[in-house]
Amino acid sequence: GLEKKDVTNAWDNKGDIIIGNDVWIGYEAAILAGVTIGDGAIIGTRAVVTKDVPPYTIVGGVPAKPIKRRFPEETISALLEIQWWNWSEERIARNIGAIQSGNIDQLEQGV
């Protein structure tokens, strides 16, 4: 007869895909199981992401490889500290110019 199997054990589940905040994912990009995309990362069109992507890093290709960091390390650290995406809607509205311009000094003072 047929053998009954537990389908949850039929494949090697590498875990959830975790997408950070302020991330842009290009058209037809594929992100494999168990991968974490850091805050502010950019995934290129049709990239196949097989490994974690650090915050504010641009990746592309098959498999996806880092192309460059979006900002200098001190700017990335400041943005990760500020976490403007956790602000209230009102606070974002008051600081939208600084967010859109990427003015870190204004963001750090954002009230």
Regions inferred by a protein language model and the residue ranges of each:
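ABC ATPase nucleotide-binding domains
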Residues: 91-111
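Proline-centered helix-kink/hinge sites
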Residues: 54-55, 63, 83
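Signature tryptophan residues that serve as conserved aromatic anchors
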Residues: 24, 84-87
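Short, charge-rich, low-complexity interaction segments located
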Residues: 62-71, 75-76
